[in-house]
Amino acid sequence: DRLGNEGQIQLVLPSLLAELSVLEAGPVNRSNTDFPIALSAGERRDYTANTIYRDFGWRRKDPDGSLRISPEDAATIGVETGDQARITTLVGSALARVEVTDRMMPGHAAIPNGFGLDNDDGTRSGVAPNELTSLGDCDKFAGTPHHKFVPARIEAVA
C-alpha cells in the first residue's frame, strides 16, 4: 500500500490529513478564567537531569525547583521572588517558591522536572509535576499528557 504507481514510497497518512486543518486555525487557547496560566510542568533546567536532582550540590541556586513566572503575572498575583505561591490545576495543588523572571512570557509559568521526590531525611523538595498533570488531557495520537501546557491558577500564600 505504501508504494505508488511510480514505485515511490507514499508518506501521506490519511488518518493525519484531517488533523492538519487544526494548524491553519492557529494556536489553541487552552486557558480559561478558572485556570488562566499555561504551566509548563517539567521544564528542563541545567541541574534537573534525571537523578542529578539527588545531589544537592547541583541545585544550590534553586534547591526547591522554583515556580518561574513573569514580572507582569507576579505583579497581578502579588508575589515576589522568594515568596510562596499555590499552584492549582484541575487535578492537584502544590506550594512552590516563586522566581520572578523576564524569561517567562505573561500568562506562562514553569516548574522543573525531577522535583517532588522524598529525600533521605524525610523532607520533600519542590513540586512533583505529575501531581499537577491530568492523565485525561493527553495528545490524541501519542497518549502522553500535555505537560508543557497545563491550565493552572497561581495564588499568593500569606
Identify the meaning behind each predicted range.
Residues 55-68, 72-158:
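Long, contiguous, secondary-structure-rich segments that constitute the structural scaffold
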Residues 1-57:
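Long, low-complexity segments enriched in small/aliphatic residues
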